[in-house]
A protein has these predicted regions:
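Mobile "lid/hinge" segments at catalytic clefts and subdomain interfaces of large enzymes
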Residues: 78, 82-100, 104-118, 122-270
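Extended, well-folded interaction surfaces typified by the phenylalanyl-tRNA synthetase beta subunit core
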Residues: 2-99, 114, 131, 275-278, ...
């Protein structure tokens, strides 16, 4: 299971409660505490909760459980003016791309470490070791628009991340650790996917490695996130998780227009999903005799909301697939520690022979 290391002082600041309370409540949002030492806590989270891959996502859930913030988190989207033109040659290689811009950021080294950790956890989980989805992070101030997502020959060269000299795409796949590890995602391709800007600067060779020219540092104020892959649904999920995390970091989110032939679409999609409100099922599944008003309050403590007869589920909650999942969220919002276990009466009483 994935593990994330969190600085407790940062988490105190993000949630607004002391460390003692944090350590008491972490298990009640579904996290297992692995260790506490040197001012940090290592927590294990379920792969179906990738939004817990940073302290920002964990703090968001804790603020709900503690009643500090209720209901859907709100992230405003504005037009960034950034566009990506997609090469039709990638239709059989790695056809999907979606992006988001986050501006107004003030990053420290721990922010960057956590973003990279989230990136890698998403690669391994939803990304299926980058075969299905891969993510790139870029300093947008170093990019000249528009951008191009192209299929280029194996002989094309650029300077990969953390390298000082140019390497061809073919050499990267054969001679670098990351290339050998993930080259299987491009087996059989006659052209390789590359993201470049209008000046020819390489942002990324997905799903292998980013370019060195657009690396993110503590001086970066505006990040461009690209998500490429073979499955649109998984790519949209991953981008929603990353966009909401950048929103929690204080970033102003901007849309990116993706142009593929005559098709145009705007990403990311962070609109909440809707599911039926079924208070009777909640009572049946949880065993809690809650009024509908109490059910709604528990839903809001789990950072969801209710409108009419619909439960509004934040887009980053990719784990909620069924009404039973909503019932589980009600139990978490109610407080697992408040639920008293009862042994069911047996209708098969034993007897001595």
């Amino acid at each position: 299971l994935p593990v994330v290391s969190i600085e407790l002082k940062r988490l105190e600041r993000l949630v607004g409660v002391p460390t003692k309370v944090l350590l008491q409540r972490l298990p009640y949002i579904g996290l297992d505490i692995e260790s506490v030492e040197a001012g940090s806590v290592r927590v294990e989270y379920s792969p179906n909760r990738p939004d817990f891959g940073t302290d920002y996502g964990i703090a968001r859930a804790l603020r709900g459980l503690l009643g500090i913030e209720l209901g859907l988190p709100r992230y405003r989207l504005s037009r960034s003016g950034v566009s990506v033109k997609v090469d039709g040659a990638l239709s059989r290689v790695r056809p999907f791309i979606a992006c988001v811009v986050a501006s107004g950021l003030r990053l420290d080294s721990e922010d960057i470490r956590q973003l990279i950790s989230l990136q890698e956890d998403l690669h391994e989980g939803l990304g299926r070791r980058r075969r299905r989805v891969a993510i790139g992070l870029h300093d947008l101030s170093r990019v000249k628009q528009p951008l191009f997502y192209e299929g280029l020959p194996p002989s094309f060269s650029f300077v990969p991340l953390d390298m000082k000299e140019e390497m061809s795409l073919a050499r990267i796949l054969k001679e670098t650790d990351v290339g050998r590890r993930y080259s299987g995602a491009l087996d059989g391709a006659s052209v390789y996917p590359v993201i470049r800007d209008s000046s020819g600067t390489v942002l990324s060779f997905p799903p292998i490695v980013n370019g060195n020219a657009t690396r993110v540092t503590t001086e970066t104020k505006e990040i461009l996130v690209d998500v490429t892959g073979t499955e649109k649904a998984a790519g949209d999920d991953v981008l929603a998780i990353f966009a909401s995390t950048l929103g929690e970091m204080g970033g102003r989110l901007g849309t990116v227009e993706i142009i593929s032939g005559s098709e145009r679409r705007v990403t990311p999609d962070i609109k909440p999903r809707a599911a039926p409100l079924d208070s009777a099922l909640v009572r049946e599944v949880t065993g809690l005799e809650l009024t509908e008003r109490e059910v709604i309050q528990c839903i809001r403590r789990s950072r969801m909301d209710v409108k009419g007869r619909k439960v509004l589920i934040p887009r980053y909650r990719v784990d909620i697939l069924h009404r039973v999942d909503i019932a589980e969220e009600v139990a978490l919002g109610y407080g697992i520690d408040r639920i008293q276990p009862l042994y069911p009466p047996s209708d098969r009483p034993g007897r001595f022979n």
